[in-house]
C-alpha cells in the first residue's frame, strides 16, 4: 500500500516514494504462523574501570594506569556508539511497524466509509420497500373487499380468473373480485407477512454486521499505540567528552617529569577520575544499556501489537467483503406480494383494459371506414382512367391494334382482426370511473384512468402533422393529409389549433400592451419643444391650391380691379404670389415636421428595441448564469459522487487484481505440481515398466522353477516308490532266509522278529558247526568279501547321507542321490542273492552231513553281524524314505503355493497391464492436449536438427514455405503416433521392447520444461499486451469522455453531426424564411422549421441536431413536373410556396443538408422588436451611419448582434440564393421609417457607382476583415453566455 492507505498500482509504482508490504501468512486471521525473529542486538557489556597501581611513587606505573583507563574509556565509548546505532535501528523499525499498522487502518477506514454509504442507500431502499410492504399488508383485506363492491364485466377472458368456479358464473356482469383468486390471495397474506419479516430480519442482520464492523474499526482507531521512541543521543554526547578528557589527561601525564610534585598532581588527577569521571561514564553506559533493552522491548511490543491489529483488520475486511456481497445481492422477490399487489392494481388494470378496448374498437371502425373510402376513391380513379383509355383508343383505333382496355386496380383487405375484443362504450368507462371515485380507496386509480380517458381524443403525432394542410406551402402535403382524415379527426385537430391560436393571441395581446405602454411612456418625445410652434404652422396639411372662399375673394377683387390703378394691380398680384409661396412653405414645413416626427418615432422605437434587447439579453444571461451555477453545483456533486465511486471501483479493481495475482500464483503452483506429477508419472511408468519386466522375468523363472519342481517331484516319487520296493525286497529276502533256516516255521511279521528268529535258528545251527569246517576257508573268503561289501555299503551310506544333506540344500543333486540309492539297492540285492546262495549252500552241506560247529558258529556270527548291519541299513533306508516322503510333501505344497502365486502374479500382471494401458493412454492424451493447447496459443512443436523447438505458427509456415528449406533444416512435427499405444500387443518380447522404447521416446520428445516456458512467456506477453491495451483504453476513454463533455456544451461550426449543438440564424432570403446553421466553411445546412421553434419571434435559435438529411438539387425533376403555383409573399402565411426538391431556391447540382433540431434550453425570452424582422434593423444599422448619429451606449448590443448576423448571412449564403428578393414581411412602422433612408442610400449608391475597381476591392477586403472581427466578437459573446458572468 501507499502511505495514503491506497493499494499500489503498477502504473504509479515508479512515482511512489515509499510503499508498505504485508505478508499474508502473518496478517491473515486463519494463519497462525510465528513471526520470524530478528537477531537481537549485541548487549552492552560493562567492565570495571582499571584501578590497579603497582607503585604510587613510580611515574611509569601512573602512566600505565592512565593508559589502561584511556583504553577502557575508548572501548566503552565505541560499545556505546554501537548500542546507540542499534537503538536508532530498532526505533526506526518500530516506527515503520506502527506506520504500517496505521496505513492498513486508513485503508480499512476507506472501505468502511464506502460500506456505510452503500448500506445507507440500501437501507433507504429497504425502508421504502418495507413501507410499501407494510401498507400492502395492512390494506390488502380492505382492497379485496373493495374489489367485491366494484362492478365489472366478465367478457375479458384474458384477465386472470380464479381456479374454482363461483356462483352466478353465467351472468354477464360481476365484480372485480372475479378476476382475482381470493383463496390464493388469502393464502398469500400470511406468506407475504412471513416474507416481509424475513426481509426485515435480513436487513437487521446486515445492519448488525455493519454496526459490528464500524464498532470494530472505531475500537481500532481509539486503541492507537503510543509511537514515542527514546533515543540515546544525549547520553552519547555526554560520554564522549568524558572519554576525550581521560585521553587528554593521559597525554598530559606522558609529558610530565618524574618528581614528587608531579606525582602529587597525577595522584590528585587520578583521584578525580576515580571519584567523578569513571563513575559518570559507567552510569551513562548503564542508561544506554537500559535504553537499548527498552528499545528491544518496545520493538517486540510494537510488532505484537501491529500483528494483532493487522489480524483484526484482516478479519474486519473479510467480514466487510461478505457484507458488501450481501448488500450487492440484496433483492426481494415474493410471489405472495405479487398476488397482493395484483389486488391493488386490479382496478387500474381493468380500467386500462376498458380504455384499450374502446381505443381498439374505434381504431378498427376507423380502419374499416377509411379502407372503404380509400377503395371508393381508387375505384373512381380507376373508372376515370378506364373511360379516358377507351376514349383515346377510340380516337386512335385506326392507327393502333391495341385491344387491352383493362386498368390496374387495388384491392384493399383488412387483416389481423381474428381476435375481437369485447365491445365497450365510452359511457361504460365513465360509469366505471364514477364507481371508482365513489369508492374512497380507489381515488388515485380513478384520476389516472380519467387522464387516460382524456387521451382517447388526443390526436397522434402523425395526425397533428397531417392536420396542417400546407406545410411550408406544399400542396403535396395537402393531398396526403386529405386522406384518412375525417370529421372526428378534423374536429380534434381544429380544437388543438384553436388552443394554439388562443395561446398565440394571448402572447400577441401581451406584446401589444407592452408596446402601447412603451409608446405611451415615450410619447412626450414626439411633441414640439415650443408651445407656440403650432400657431405658426397649423396641424392640417397645406395644399398648393387655395380654398374656394379665398378663390372667390380673389376673383371678386380681380373683378373690381378694373377700376384700380396699375400699382394696385401689381400689389394684388404680389399678394397672390406671396400667398402661393406661403402655401408652399407651409407644405414644406409640414413635410419636414412629419419627417422629424417619423425620425423621432423611429429613434424612439430603436431605443426601445435596443433597451428591450439588452434587457432580454441580460435576463437570458442571468437565467443562463443561474442554470450554469445550478448545473455546476449539480456537476460538482456528481463529480464528488463519481470520485467516491471511482475510488470504490479502484479498490475493487485492486482486490480483483490481488485475487487474480493469487489465482495466477495458484495456477503456477498447480502447473508446477502438475509438471512434478507428470515427471513422477513418467518415473512411475518407468518403474512400473521395469517392475513389469522384472515380473515377467520372475514369472519366467517361476515357471522354469515350477517345471523343475514338477520334474523333481516326479523323481522323488519315483525314488520313494523304488525305496518302498527295496524295503519289500529286503523283507522278502529276510523271509526267504528264515524260511530257508526253518522251512516249516511261520515267518514273523516284523523284520526284528525275523532277525531274532534267524538268531535262534543260527544257534541251532551251531550243532552242525563241525560239519562246516571244510567250508571255513570259503566262508572266511566270503566273510572278507562281505566285510568289503559292508564297508562299501557304509561308504555308500555316508555318501547317501551327504547326498541327502546336499539334496536339502541343492535340489539339483536329487537325481544323483536317487541314482546312488539305486546302485546301493542293487548292491544290497546282489549281496542278498549271495547270502541266499551261501545259505542254500550251507543247507546243502548240512543236508550232506558235513559238520564243523566252530566254523559254523563263526559263520553264523558273521551272518548275524551282516544281518544287524543290513537291518541298520534298512532302518536308515526307511528313515531316508520317510524324509524323502516328507520332502516330497513339502515340495508338493511348495509347488501348489507356487502355482497359486503364479496365478496371483498372472492376475496382478493382467491388472497392471490394463493400468499400464490406461496410463499410456492418459499420458498420450495429456501430451496431445498440451500440444493442442500450444496450437491454440499460436505455437507449433517441431523437431529441428534433433532438438525440440516451440515456435510461432507464422514462423513455422514461413519455414515450411519451400521443400528445400524444410529438408535442409530438418523441421519435423513432434505429434505422437497413436499406433504406439499398442506397444504391449507385441508377439515377441523383443518386439514389445522395441515398441515400448518407441513409445517412451515419443513421450520424451515432448519436453514439459519447454512447454512451461512457452506458456509462461505467452501469458506474460498477453499480460503485458493486456496492460498496454487497458492503459490505452483508459486513456482513450478518458479522452473521449473529456472531449464529449467539452463538445457537448460547445457550439459546433463545422462538420455537423447528430447530437451537436448548433446556432441557427435567419438568412437574408426573407421570401422563404430560411434558417441556416452558423458555420465556418460548411454552408448549406438548413433548419427544418417546426412549431415548437417559434422562429417568427426569434433572432437566433440554439438547438441540438437530431437528424441530418443529405440532398442534392435536381432542377430537371421540377422542370419536367411543371411549375407549381407560386403565391405572392403577402398572400402566403409561411412565405413563398416552394418545391421539396429545392425548398431554398439553390442552384442545380448543389448538395445541401436539412437538419432536424430540438432547442437545447427552451424558454429563452423573445425580443419584441427584432423578432418582427431580422433584416430591416440590419439595414437600418448599416445605413444609419450616413444620415443618423447614434449614441454609442444605446445600441452597442444590437449593433454587435446585427453585425454578427449580417456577417453570418454573408458567409453562409449560397451563391445560388437570390439576394434581390425584397423583404416584404417586416414591421409596418419600421418599413415606413426606413423608406426615406433607403431612398437616400440608393442615391448615394448611384453616386458611388463610378468608383474604381481598386476601391471596390479594398472595400471587399475591409468587409471581410469586419466579418472576421464580428465573428470573433460573436464567439466571445457565445463564450461569455456559456461560462456565465
UniProtKB/Swiss-Prot annotation:
GO MF annotations in UniProt: molecular adaptor activity; protein kinase binding
Region (Disordered) location: 32-52, 523-568, 595-615, 1116-1142, 1181-1285
Keyword Metal-binding: no
Record membrane topology: Peripheral membrane protein
Subcellular location: Preautophagosomal structure membrane; Vacuole membrane
Biased composition range(s): Low complexity: 551-562
Main location: membrane
GO biological process, one term: autophagy of mitochondrion
Ranges of biased composition (kind: Polar residues): 601-615, 1197-1215
Compositionally biased residues, Basic and acidic residues: 1275-1285
Highest taxon above the source species: Eukaryota
Pfam families: ATG11, ATG17_like
Keyword tags: Autophagy, Coiled coil, Membrane, Protein transport, Transport, Vacuole
Disulfide bonds: none
CC per GO annotation: Atg1/ULK1 kinase complex; phagophore assembly site membrane; vacuolar membrane
Coiled-coil residue windows: 73-150, 486-523, 563-726, 769-937
Family under the similarity heading: Belongs to the ATG11 family.
Quaternary structure note: Homodimer.
Role this protein plays: Involved in cytoplasm to vacuole transport (Cvt), pexophagy, mitophagy and nucleophagy. Recruits mitochondria for their selective degradation via autophagy (mitophagy) during starvation. Works as scaffold proteins that recruit ATG proteins to the pre-autophagosome (PAS), the site of vesicle/autophagosome formation. Required for the Cvt vesicles completion.
This protein's name: Autophagy-related protein 11
Species: Emericella nidulans (strain FGSC A4 / ATCC 38163 / CBS 112.46 / NRRL 194 / M139)
Gene transcribed to yield this protein: atg11
Amino acid at each position: 500500500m501507499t502511505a495514503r492507505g491506497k493499494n499500489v498500482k503498477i502504473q504509479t509504482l515508479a512515482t511512489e516514494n515509499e510503499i508498505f508490504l504485508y505478508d499474508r501468512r502473518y496478517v491473515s486471521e486463519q494463519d497462525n504462523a510465528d513471526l520470524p525473529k530478528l537477531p537481537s542486538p549485541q548487549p552492552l557489556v560493562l567492565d570495571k574501570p582499571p584501578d590497579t597501581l603497582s607503585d604510587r611513587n613510580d611515574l611509569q606505573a601512573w602512566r600505565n594506569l592512565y593508559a589502561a583507563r584511556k583504553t577502557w574509556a575508548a572501548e566503552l565509548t565505541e560499545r556505546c556508539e554501537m548500542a546507540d546505532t542499534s537503538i536508532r535501528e530498532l526505533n526506526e523499525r518500530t516506527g515503520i511497524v506502527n506506520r504500517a499498522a496505521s496505513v492498513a487502518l486508513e485503508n480499512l477506514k476507506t472501505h468502511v466509509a464506502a460500506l456505510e454509504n452503500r448500506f445507507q442507500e440500501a437501507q433507504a431502499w429497504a425502508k421504502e420497500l418495507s413501507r410499501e410492504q407494510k401498507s400492502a399488508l395492512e390494506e390488502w383485506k380492505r382492497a379485496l373487499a373493495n374489489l367485491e363492491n366494484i362492478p365489472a364485466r366478465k367478457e375479458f377472458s384474458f384477465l386472470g380468473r380464479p381456479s374454482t368456479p363461483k356462483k352466478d358464473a353465467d351472468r354477464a356482469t360481476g365484480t372485480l373480485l372475479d378476476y382475482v383468486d381470493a383463496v390464493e390471495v388469502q393464502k398469500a397474506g400470511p406468506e407475504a407477512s412471513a416474507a416481509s419479516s424475513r426481509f426485515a430480519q435480513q436487513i437487521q442482520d446486515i445492519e448488525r454486521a455493519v454496526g459490528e464492523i464500524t464498532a470494530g474499526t472505531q475500537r481500532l482507531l481509539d486503541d492507537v499505540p503510543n509511537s514515542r521512541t527514546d533515543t540515546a543521543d544525549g547520553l552519547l554526547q555526554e560520554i564522549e567528552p568524558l572519554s576525550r578528557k581521560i585521553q587528554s589527561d593521559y597525554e598530559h601525564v606522558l609529558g610530565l617529569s618524574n618528581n614528587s610534585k608531579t606525582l602529587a598532581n597525577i595522584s590528585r588527577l587520578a583521584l578525580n577520575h576515580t571519584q567523578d569521571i569513571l563513575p559518570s561514564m559507567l552510569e551513562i553506559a548503564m542508561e544506554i544499556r537500559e535504553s537499548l533493552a527498552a528499545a528491544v522491548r518496545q520493538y517486540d511490543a510494537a510488532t505484537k501489537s501491529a500483528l494483532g491489529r493487522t489480524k483484526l483488520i484482516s478479519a474486519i475486511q473479510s467480514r466487510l467483503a461478505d457484507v458488501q456481497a450481501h448488500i450487492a445481492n440484496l433483492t426481494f422477490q415474493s410471489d405472495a406480494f405479487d398476488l397482493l399487489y395484483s389486488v391493488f392494481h386490479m382496478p387500474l388494470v381493468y380500467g386500462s383494459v376498458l380504455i384499450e378496448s374502446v381505443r381498439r374498437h374505434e381504431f378498427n371502425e376507423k380502419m374499416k371506414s377509411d379502407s372503404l373510402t380509400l377503395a371508393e376513391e381508387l375505384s373512381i380513379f380507376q373508372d376515370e382512367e378506364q373511360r379516358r383509355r377507351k376514349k383515346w383508343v377510340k380516337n386512335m383505333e385506326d392507327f393502333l391494334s391495341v385491344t387491352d382496355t383493362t386498368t390496374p386496380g387495388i384491392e384493399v383487405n383488412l387483416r389481423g382482426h381474428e381476435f375481437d375484443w369485447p365491445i365497450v362504450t365510452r359511457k361504460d368507462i365513465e360509469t366505471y370511473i364514477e364507481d371508482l371515485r365513489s369508492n374512497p380507496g380507489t381515488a388515485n386509480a380513478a384520476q389516472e384512468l380519467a387522464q387516460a380517458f382524456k387521451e382517447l381524443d388526443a390526436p397522434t403525432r402523425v395526425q397533428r402533422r397531417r392536420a396542417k394542410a400546407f406545410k411550408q406551402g406544399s400542396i403535396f402535403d395537402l393531398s396526403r393529409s386529405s386522406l384518412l382524415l375525417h370529421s372526428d379527426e378534423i374536429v380534434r385537430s381544429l380544437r388543438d389549433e384553436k388552443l394554439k391560436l388562443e395561446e398565440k393571441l394571448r402572447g400577441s395581446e401581451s406584446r401589444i400592451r407592452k408596446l402601447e405602454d412603451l409608446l405611451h411612456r415615450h410619447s412626450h418625445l414626439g411633441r414640439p419643444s415650443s408651445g407656440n410652434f403650432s400657431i405658426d404652422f397649423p396641424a392640417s396639411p397645406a395644399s398648393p391650391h387655395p380654398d374656394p372662399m379665398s378663390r372667390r375673394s380673389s376673383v371678386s377683387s380681380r373683378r373690381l380691379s378694373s377700376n384700380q390703378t396699375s400699382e394696385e394691380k401689381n400689389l394684388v398680384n404680389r399678394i397672390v404670389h406671396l400667398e402661393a409661396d406661403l402655401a408652399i412653405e407651409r407644405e414644406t414645413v409640414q413635410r419636414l415636421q412629419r419627417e422629424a416626427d417619423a425620425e423621432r418615432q423611429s429613434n424612439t422605437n430603436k431605443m426601445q428595441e435596443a433597451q428591450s434587447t439588452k434587457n432580454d439579453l441580460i435576463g437570458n444571461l442571468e437565467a443562463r448564469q443561474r442554470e450554469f451555477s445550478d448545473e455546476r453545483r449539480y456537476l460538482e456533486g456528481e463529480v464528488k459522487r463519481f470520485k467516491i465511486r471511482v475510488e470504490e471501483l479502484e479498490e475493487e479493481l485492486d482486490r480483483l487484481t490481488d485475487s487474480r495475482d493469487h489465482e495466477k500464483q495458484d495456477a503456477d503452483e498447480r502447473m508446477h505440481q502438475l509438471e512434478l506429477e507428470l515427471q513422477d508419472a513418467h518415473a512411475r511408468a518407468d518403474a512400473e515398466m521395469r517392475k513389469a519386466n522384472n515380473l515377467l522375468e520372475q514369472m519366467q523363472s517361476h515357471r522354469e522353477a515350477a517345471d523343475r519342481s514338477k520334474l523333481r517331484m516326479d523323481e522323488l516319487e519315483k525314488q520313494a516308490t523304488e525305496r518302498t520296493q527295496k524295503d519289500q525286497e529286503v523283507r522278502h529276502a529276510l523271509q526267504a532266509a528264515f524260511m530257508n533256516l526253518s522251512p516249516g516255521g511261520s515267518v514273523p511279521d516284523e523284520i526284528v522278529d525275523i532277525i531274532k528268529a534267524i538268531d535262534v535258528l543260527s544257534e541251532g545251527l551251531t550243532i552242525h558247526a563241525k560239519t562246516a569246517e571244510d567250508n571255513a576257508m570259503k566262508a572266511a573268503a566270503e566273510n572278507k568279501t562281505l566285510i568289503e561289501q559292508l564297508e562299501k555299503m557304509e561308504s555308500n551310506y555316508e555318501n547317501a547321507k551327504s547326498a541327502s544333506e546336499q539334496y536339502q540344500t541343492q535340489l539339483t543333486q536329487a537325481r544323483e542321490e536317487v541314482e546312488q540309492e539305486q546302485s546301493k539297492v542293487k548292491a544290497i540285492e546282489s549281496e542278498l542273492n549271495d547270502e541266499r546262495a551261501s545259505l542254500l549252500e550251507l543247507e546243502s552241506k548240512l543236508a550232506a552231513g558235513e559238520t564243523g560247529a566252530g566254523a559254523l558258529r563263526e559263520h553264523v556270527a558273521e551272518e548275524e553281524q551282516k544281518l544287524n548291519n543290513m537291518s541298520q541299513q534298512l532302518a536308515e533306508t526307511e528313515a531316508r524314505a520317510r524324509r524323502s516322503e516328507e520332502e516330497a510333501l513339502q515340495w508338493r505344497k511348495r509347488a501348489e503355493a507356487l502355482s497359486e502365486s503364479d496365478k496371483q502374479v498372472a492376475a496382478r500382471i493382467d491388472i497392471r497391464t490394463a493400468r499400464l494401458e490406461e496410463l499410456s493412454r492418459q499420458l498420450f492424451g495429456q501430451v496431445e492436449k498440451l500440444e493442442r493447447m500450444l496450437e491454440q496459443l499460436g505455437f507449433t512443436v517441431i523437431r529441428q536438427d534433433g532438438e525440440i523447438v516451440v515456435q510461432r505458427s507464422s514462423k513455422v509456415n514461413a519455414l515450411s514455405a519451400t521443400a528445400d528449406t524444410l529438408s535442409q533444416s530438418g523441421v519435423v512435427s513432434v505429434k505422437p503416433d497413436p499406433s504406439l499405444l499398442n506397444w504391449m500387443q507385441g508377439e515377441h518380447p523383443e518386439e514389445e521392447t522395441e515398441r515400448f522404447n518407441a513409445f517412451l521416446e515419443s513421450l520424451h520428445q515432448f519436453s514439459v520444461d519447454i512447454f512451461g516456458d512457452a506458456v509462461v512467456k505467452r501469458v506474460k506477453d498477453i499480460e503485458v499486451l493486456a496492460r498496454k491495451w487497458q492503459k490505452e483504453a483508459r486513456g482513450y476513454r478518458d479522452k473521449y469522455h473529456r472531449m464529449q463533455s467539452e463538445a457537448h456544451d460547445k457550439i459546433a461550426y463545422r462538420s455537423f453531426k447528430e447530437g451537436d449543438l448548433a446556432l441557427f440564424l435567419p438568412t437574408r432570403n426573407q421570401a422563404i424564411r430560411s434558417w441556416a446553421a452558423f458555420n465556418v466553411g460548411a454552408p448549406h445546412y438548413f433548419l427544418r422549421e417546426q412549431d415548437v421553434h417559434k422562429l417568427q419571434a426569434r433572432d437566433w435559435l440554439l438547438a441540438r441536431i437530431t437528424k441530418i438529411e443529405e440532398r442534392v438539387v435536381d432542377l430537371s425533376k421540377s422542370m419536367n413536373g411543371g411549375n407549381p403555383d407560386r403565391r405572392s409573399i403577402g398572400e402566403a402565411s409561411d412565405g413563398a410556396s416552394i418545391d421539396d426538391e429545392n425548398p431554398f431556391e439553390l442552384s442545380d447540382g448543389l448538395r445541401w443538408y436539412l437538419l432536424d433540431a430540438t432547442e437545447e434550453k427552451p424558454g429563452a425570452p423573445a425580443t419584441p422588436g427584432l423578432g418582427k424582422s431580422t433584416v430591416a434593423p440590419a439595414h437600418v444599422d448599416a445605413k444609419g451611419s450616413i444620415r443618423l448619429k447614434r449614441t454609442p451606449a444605446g445600441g452597442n448590443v444590437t449593433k454587435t448582434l446585427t453585425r454578427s448576423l449580417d456577417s453570418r448571412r454573408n458567409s453562409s449564403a449560397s451563391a445560388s440564393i437570390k439576394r434581390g428578393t425584397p423583404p416584404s414581411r417586416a414591421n409596418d412602422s419600421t418599413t415606413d421609417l426606413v423608406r426615406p433612408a433607403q431612398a437616400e442610400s440608393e442615391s448615394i449608391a448611384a453616386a458611388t457607382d463610378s468608383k474604381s475597381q481598386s476601391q471596390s476591392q479594398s472595400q471587399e477586403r475591409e468587409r471581410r476583415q469586419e466579418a472576421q472581427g464580428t465573428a470573433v466578437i460573436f464567439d466571445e459573446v457565445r463564450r461569455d453566455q456559456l461560462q456565465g458572468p
